[in-house]
């Protein structure tokens, strides 16, 4: 069988390739690779250098913020700071420096001294000389507020008036001494010798605001018993016999009831206890004498308070006495059915500038009433308190002289019954 190819057209045989020989690379691709590597390395280097410069700049800025960064001292030992105060009276001060150049002179300012900032001398290679800083100027003392600064301002005229009032009070106290129950009872005994219709009621113990009504009613009941010839039911006085007391009750037409008052106690027992305590101490304290006159003949209740409203207001006292007057109308009725009336004697404070003349004022008012019960002698009192008490002092001296011969705590003899 014949081959399809022509036998005459023969091709040259291809020699076999040797597998051991290396395949050669062209030089152009190799140069391009080297250029890429070089460019990459250059870019990386530029980036590193840029970052390094940035870090170096920020590091230098941080170092510059420290206080020791810009100082040129070679030594690590910190130089002491010298503060030089510049007071007014002192001469100009020179700041000493360890260096050879002369120190600059700090001239004194024309304005008042102010706190001087600390001056740091420049450092030198040599060791600085130790120096002691001068003492700081004393601080201005803080204003101290005294008790006078805290008190309100009082005008001088007020002190003058207070001094005059104090001097006036001392003068009045020297003119009129305090009267106790013994002097008052002696004064009543003396008044009985002048006016037979007055009964000298004992003032030991005296009546109080809590029992004066019961005492008045008891005396009027005993008077009715004497007029009827019956025995008395009330208690007898300490220093008076029953016969003498009955004679006094028979002829009396006026009952002077002295009341002892103190604002602290609120009951009768507490009042008597306070009275004993003050008597032991020998002090009057805040006690006060009051007077209630029971005028049987004129059918009238007269209330006198030299302090005007020490116990209660005059309006309240008048209402209370009006109620008591109605009770007396039933206890001791009049033959002509006349009713008891009430009168508040004092219209103002009588004992101005005095705290212990109340007993003497009660006796003075009683003496005025005995002389003329229908004339108000209080309207004629002097306005000046010193002059008023000078007149009272004259009455006191006359009474004290009159009672010197009277026996102690002894009732005067009343007239015999008819």
Swiss-Prot record:
Keyword Cytoplasm: no
Regions crossing the membrane: 40-60
The keyword Disulfide bond is annotated on this UniProt entry: no
Pro residues biased stretches: 86-141
Localisation: Secreted; Host cell; Membrane
Gene3D superfamilies: Adenoviral Proteinase, Chain A
UniProt similarity note: Belongs to the peptidase C48 family.
The protein, known as: Deubiquitinase and deneddylase Dub1
């Amino acid at each position: 069988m014949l081959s399809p190819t022509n036998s005459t057209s023969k091709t040259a045989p291809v020699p076999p390739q040797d597998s051991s020989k290396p395949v050669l690379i062209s030089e152009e691709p190799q140069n391009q690779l080297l250029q890429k590597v070089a460019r990459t390395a250059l870019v990386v280097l530029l980036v590193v250098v840029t970052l390094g410069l940035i870090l170096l700049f920020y590091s230098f800025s941080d170092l510059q913020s420290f206080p020791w960064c810009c100082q040129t001292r070679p030594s690590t030992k910190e130089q002491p700071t010298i503060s030089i105060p510049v007071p007014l009276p002192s001469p100009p001060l020179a700041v000493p420096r360890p260096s050879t150049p002369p120190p600059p002179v700090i001239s004194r300012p024309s304005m008042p001294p102010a706190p001087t900032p600390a001056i740091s001398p420049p450092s030198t290679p040599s060791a600085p000389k130790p120096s002691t800083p001068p003492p700081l100027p004393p601080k201005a003392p803080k204003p101290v507020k005294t008790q006078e600064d805290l008190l309100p301002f009082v005008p001088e005229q007020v002190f003058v008036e207070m001094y005059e009032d104090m001097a006036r009070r001392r003068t009045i106290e020297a003119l009129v001494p305090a009267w106790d129950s013994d002097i008052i009872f002696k004064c009543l005994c003396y008044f009985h010798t002048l006016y037979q219709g007055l009964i000298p009621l004992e003032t030991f113990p005296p009546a109080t605001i809590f029992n004066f009504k019961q005492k008045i009613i008891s005396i009027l009941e005993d008077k009715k018993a004497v007029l009827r010839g019956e025995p008395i039911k009330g208690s007898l006085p300490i220093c008076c016999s029953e016969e003498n007391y009955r004679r006094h009750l028979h002829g009396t037409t006026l009952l002077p009831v002295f009341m002892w008052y103190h604002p602290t106690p609120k009951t009768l027992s507490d009042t008597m206890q306070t009275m004993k305590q003050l008597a032991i101490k020998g002090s009057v304290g805040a006690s006060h004498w009051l007077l209630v006159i029971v005028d049987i003949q004129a059918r009238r209740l007269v209330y006198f308070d030299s302090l005007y409203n020490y116990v209660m207001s005059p309006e309240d006292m008048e209402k209370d006495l009006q109620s008591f007057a109605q009770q007396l109308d039933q206890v001791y009725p009049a033959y002509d059915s006349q009713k008891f009336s009430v009168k508040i004697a004092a219209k103002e404070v009588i004992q101005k500038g005095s705290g212990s003349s109340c007993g003497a004022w009660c006796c003075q008012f009683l003496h005025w009433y005995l002389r003329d019960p229908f004339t108000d002698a209080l309207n004629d009192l002097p306005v000046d308190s010193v002059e008023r008490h000078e007149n009272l002092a004259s009455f006191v001296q006359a009474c004290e002289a009159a009672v010197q011969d009277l026996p102690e705590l002894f009732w005067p003899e009343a007239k015999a019954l008819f």
